[in-house]
Amino acid sequence: MSKNSKAYREAAEKVDREKLYTPLEATKLAKETSSKKYDATVEVAMRLGVDPRKADQMVRGTVNLPHGTGKTARVIVFAVGDKAEAAAAAGADVVGSDDLIERIQGGWVDFDAAIATPDQMAKVGRIARVLGPRGLMPNPKTGTVTPDVAKAVTDIKGGKINFRVDKHSNLHLIIGKASFDAEKLTENYGAVLDEILRAKPSSAKGRYLKKVVVSTTTGPGIQVDPGVTRNFLEA
C-alpha cells in the first residue's frame, strides 16, 4: 500500500495523529488500516531514552512471543558432528561450518536467525561484518551461541525473537500478522514491552520509553501511550 495511494490515505484518515492509543486500541486499528490484499506483518517501533554509543546503554535481548510471529523463521546453524545432526533434526533450515561461511561470504543472507556452537565462533568471526549490521551475529546474550543448538532452533521457530537498539536509539520488532486477533497481537506486544522494560540500563537517565508506534508493514503509524505498561488488554 503506497503512501500516495487512495487506500493508504483512507487508512491514514482513520488514525488520530494527536492521540495516544491503548495497546488494544492500537492493534485493533492496525488490523483495520491494514492492506486487504495480503496478510501484512504487524510491527512495533520504539524510541528509547538511551545513548547506544555508550556500552552500558546498549539495549538488547530476546523475547518469546506467546502467539509467535505468524511466519516461520529461516534458521541457520554453525555446527559439526552430533551438534549438526541435532540442529537438523530440530528443524534448522541450513546447517554447516566452513561451507556455510563461504556461502555467506559469497553474498547469501536469506535467513532470519543464526545459531552457533561455541567452538564455531572463531570461524564465524570471519563473517561478523556481514552478520553484525543485520543483527544476525550469534551472541551468548541472546542464546544463539550455545551447545544446545536443538533447543535454540526450537525456541526461534516457536516465536523467540531478538532485539537490539540501533544507533538512533530505535527498536523494531514484529508482533504478528494482521490476521491475528487483536487480543493476541496485544499479548505479543505486552511480552515485548515487558522485556524492553526489563532490559533498561541502570545508567539510562530521564524518560526511557520516549515513543511507541504500532503499524502494519505498509500501513499508517499508530502512536501508543508509552505509560501503559500493564493490563494491556484494557481498552
Curated annotation (Swiss-Prot):
Alphabetical UniProt keywords: Repressor, Ribonucleoprotein, Ribosomal protein, RNA-binding, rRNA-binding, Translation regulation, tRNA-binding
Biological process terms in GO annotation: regulation of translation; translation
GO molecular function: rRNA binding; structural constituent of ribosome; tRNA binding
Residue ranges of the TM segments: none
Alphabetized InterPro entries for the sequence: Ribosom_uL1_bac-type, Ribosomal_uL1, Ribosomal_uL1-like, Ribosomal_uL1/biogenesis, Ribosomal_uL1_3-a/b-sand, Ribosomal_uL1_CS
Function text: Binds directly to 23S rRNA. The L1 stalk is quite mobile in the ribosome, and is involved in E site tRNA release. Protein L1 is also a translational repressor protein, it controls the translation of the L11 operon by binding to its mRNA.
Subunit details: Part of the 50S ribosomal subunit.
Similarity section: Belongs to the universal ribosomal protein uL1 family.
Annotated HAMAP family: Ribosomal_uL1_B
PANTHER family: 54S RIBOSOMAL PROTEIN L1, MITOCHONDRIAL (PTHR36427), LARGE RIBOSOMAL SUBUNIT PROTEIN UL1M (PTHR36427:SF3)
GO cellular component: large ribosomal subunit
Gene: rplA
SUPFAM superfamilies assigned to the protein according to its UniProt record, in alphabetical order: Ribosomal protein L1 (SSF56808)
Listed PROSITE patterns: RIBOSOMAL_L1
Pfam families, sorted: Ribosomal_L1 (PF00687)
Listed name of the protein: Large ribosomal subunit protein uL1
Top-level taxon: Bacteria
Metal-binding recorded as keyword: no
